[in-house]
């Protein structure tokens, strides 16, 4: 079974039994190149539903169908930019079509599944496995934005490692690029409706890609439904060539950043402030600002530290990162009059104020009890007292440490959430379609009753509530916390035709909201937590969840994975490659200490300074503080770095840093223990160099620095005849001519 089109550079051979791909062929410079594949398709159906121990929905008594069989004649049709070949198949009792799209723009081949109406079938998941065969052991793997270092020798990948999807929390470009001296192969996990789970491994000369789509549907509700699986291309040149190619792929798919952030954002220093008190291990309280007045009284110090923006968290411990009532400012943040005064006093000092806002759900006593009871009877109940460190490992599919800390958090906050909540939210009866539900009709959630951002009426409610906050408080932006937190299925009658589409519904909501708020206030900031490309479509700024594992991997060698970063130079290369495949104009907020990194570790090891020591934290602060984009810090993280923060703020305001181009120190001249980044504009440049080792480092400079003047010294340096010498655990920032 062969598929080809005169307008496509690629031809596809299908397994005649399964209808799945077995061979890709492409003519390059007159020579026919081939890539053998082995694919399987699995469908999980029917069964029963229950709450998972850590919230959401899990299934049991399901049937897993594995026998995919071709089931009819191939048909085809053309669109403006592709020829589509439809191959009918059956997987067990489920009928569907495989769509092979030969594209004239973007990746050469895209594969999707298409379902039509079938009674009595509940699809719970769809799994697509791809084996890229006969991969040379000397091949190089790049999976930018994930937990693998750049240019990874494929034979190093002994484990199965997660790949974050386009809509993931630790999001990425979702590309898997494999290359050797003769060829390259690219797989792109390009579903941006669901949030799939993907993992890669290498064994027996095969690269294995497993895609768990998280697609779910009651097929009795379906007319015709298409689910993207994966796109392929090969012989595209080296990894260094790929970002330019991928940029055209993104634009073909309409994945783009607005690329017009407020002018104040790029050099911003963001101060994350907490009102009230948070609770850890039941007896430990953290209360930097008990009341609004305490934060107002600290504004001058905050300004002198170099901060230009305050990110105000919801009040702790209630409602914390949950919804009480969007319209009740007093309960959600603090007395409205005082919050308004905080904004006014901040504005007088040239400090912007943005609010942390929640989408995932509303608290009431019913759901709090359900969540807490689930923790007490769940798999982490005996681990709540266990010591936890950083919640993110290099492997994006490893949530073990986080789930222990999350379970402890639920028990710690349970009495405060219970005291502040109504017995049952009135919204449940007033607006039943606003919530995720089991097929039984029961509301689903993690530790709130989960809102479904796909519901158009709820979108109007949320938009109105957010506009009310702007009008009443004169704030300067929002940070949308955890908008994809409800990454499970909604089986409500109106949503069950595509039950997994709710998890990313916030992206459409944000695209509708952006012009309304920009019209109200042109320099208003849209900022969200997930790092994935799907979440960058309507955002000026994204959080750096994808970067957080780098801090621990660099500072704590015992945590490193064979396939992760192992040096400062690796970290620089990782950032460079991650940024190279972001949509143009994307911006990331960097940090080392946030409320997230503070909340999840055990008491006594919450701050990076407690984990790694102040000396190392000073290096990390300069490293992440002077990356392109804003720097943010949680209140209390300034201890031991008070002198560095104003200097970082001053450098970030320099037009060379804000408007210049980047040069990363990645050549063979630069030792592994050196982090180097230069920004240059016309004939001037600023260079940051950091020696993370405990020994003096001497090396040839990648660029001429004879004209250099120090802007910041954390340690000492010398420069003689183009040879740099940096003292142990040191950092320097130099101003100099550009070559």
Task: Name each model-derived stretch.
Residues 363, 369-373, 525-564:
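Substrate-binding cleft/loops of secretory-pathway carbohydrate-active enzymes
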Residues 276, 484-487, 586-648:
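Aromatic/acidic polysaccharide-binding cleft in carbohydrate-active enzymes
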Residues 257-264, 274-290, 301, 305, ...:
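Substrate-binding/active-site clefts of carbohydrate-active enzymes
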Residues 527, 576, 634-686, 692:
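Glycan-recognition and catalytic regions of carbohydrate-active enzymes
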Residues 1-88:
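Acidic-aromatic substrate-binding/catalytic surfaces of carbohydrate-active enzymes
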């Amino acid at each position: 079974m062969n598929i080809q089109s005169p307008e496509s550079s690629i031809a596809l051979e299908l397994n005649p039994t399964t209808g799945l791909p077995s061979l890709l062929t492409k003519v390059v410079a007159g020579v026919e190149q081939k890539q053998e594949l082995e694919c399987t398709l699995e469908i999980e159906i029917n069964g029963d539903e229950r709450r998972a121990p850590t919230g959401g929905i899990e299934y049991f008594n399901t049937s897993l169908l594995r026998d995919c069989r071709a089931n009819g004649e191939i048909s085809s049709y053309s669109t403006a930019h592709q020829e589509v070949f439809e191959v009918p198949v059956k997987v067990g009792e489920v009928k569907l079509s495989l769509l092979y799209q030969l594209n004239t723009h973007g990746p050469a081949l895209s594969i999707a599944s298409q379902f039509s109406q079938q009674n009595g079938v509940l699809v719970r998941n769809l799994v697509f496995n791809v084996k890229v065969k006969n991969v040379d052991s000397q091949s190089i793997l790049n999976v930018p934005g994930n937990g693998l270092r750049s240019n990874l020798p494929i034979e190093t990948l002994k484990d199965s490692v997660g790949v974050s999807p386009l809509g993931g929390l630790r999001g990425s470009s979702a590309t898997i690029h494999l290359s050797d001296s003769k060829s390259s192969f690219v797989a792109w996990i390009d579903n941006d409706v669901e949030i799939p789970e993907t993992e890669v491994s290498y064994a027996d000369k095969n690269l294995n890609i497993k895609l768990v789509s998280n697609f779910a549907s009651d097929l009795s509700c379906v007319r015709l439904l298409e689910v993207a699986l994966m796109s392929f291309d090969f012989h595209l040149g080296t990894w260094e060539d790929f970002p330019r190619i991928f940029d055209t792929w993104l634009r073909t798919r309409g994945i783009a950043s607005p690329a017009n952030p407020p002018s104040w954002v790029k050099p911003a220093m963001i101060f994350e402030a907490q009102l009230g008190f948070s609770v850890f291990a039941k007896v430990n309280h953290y209360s930097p600002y008990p009341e609004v007045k305490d934060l107002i009284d600290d504004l001058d110090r905050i300004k002198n530290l170099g901060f230009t923006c305050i990110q105000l968290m919801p009040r702790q411990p209630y409602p914390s990162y949950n919804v009480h009532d969007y319209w009740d400012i007093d309960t959600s943040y603090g007395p409205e009059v005082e919050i308004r005064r905080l904004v006014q006093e901040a504005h007088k000092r040239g400090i912007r104020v943005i609010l942390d806002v929640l989408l995932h759900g509303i608290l009431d006593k019913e759901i709090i009890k359900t969540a807490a009871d689930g923790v007490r009877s769940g798999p982490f109940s005996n681990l709540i007292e266990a010591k936890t460190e950083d919640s993110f490992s290099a492997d994006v599919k490893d949530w073990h440490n986080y789930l222990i800390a999350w379970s402890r958090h639920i028990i710690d906050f349970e009495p405060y959430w219970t005291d502040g909540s109504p017995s049952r939210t009135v919204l449940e009866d007033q607006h039943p379609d606003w919530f995720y539900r089991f097929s039984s009709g029961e509301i689903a959630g993690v530790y709130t009753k989960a809102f479904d951002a796909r519901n158009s009426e709820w979108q109007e409610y949320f938009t109105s509530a957010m506009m009310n906050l702007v009008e009443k408080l004169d704030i300067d932006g929002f940070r949308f916390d955890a908008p994809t937190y409800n990454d499970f299925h909604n089986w409500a009658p109106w949503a069950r035709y595509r039950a997994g589409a709710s998890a990313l519904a916030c992206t459409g909501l944000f695209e509708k909201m952006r012009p309304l708020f920009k019209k109200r206030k042109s320099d208003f900031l849209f900022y969200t937590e997930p790092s994935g490309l799907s979440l960058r479509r309507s955002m000026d700024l994204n959080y750096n969840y994808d970067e957080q594992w780098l801090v621990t991997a660099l500072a704590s060698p015992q945590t490193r994975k064979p396939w992760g970063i192992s040096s400062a130079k690796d970290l620089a290369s990782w950032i460079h490659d991650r940024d190279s495949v972001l949509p143009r104009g994307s911006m990331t907020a960097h940090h080392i200490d946030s409320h997230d990194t503070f909340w999840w570790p055990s008491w006594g090891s919450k701050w990076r300074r407690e984990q790694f020591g102040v000396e190392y934290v000073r290096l990390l602060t300069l490293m992440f503080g002077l990356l392109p984009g804003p720097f943010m810090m949680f209140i209390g993280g300034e201890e031991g770095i008070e002198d560095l923060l104003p200097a970082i703020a001053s450098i970030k305001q320099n037009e060379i840093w804000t408007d210049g181009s980047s040069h990363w120190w990645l050549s063979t001249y630069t030792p592994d223990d050196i982090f180097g980044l230069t920004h240059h504009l016309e004939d001037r440049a600023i260079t940051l160099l950091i020696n993370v080792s405990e020994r003096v480092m001497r090396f040839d400079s990648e660029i001429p620095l004879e004209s250099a003047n120090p802007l910041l010294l954390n340690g000492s340096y010398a420069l003689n005849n183009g040879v740099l010498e940096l003292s142990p655990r040191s950092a320097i920032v130099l101003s100099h001519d550009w070559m």
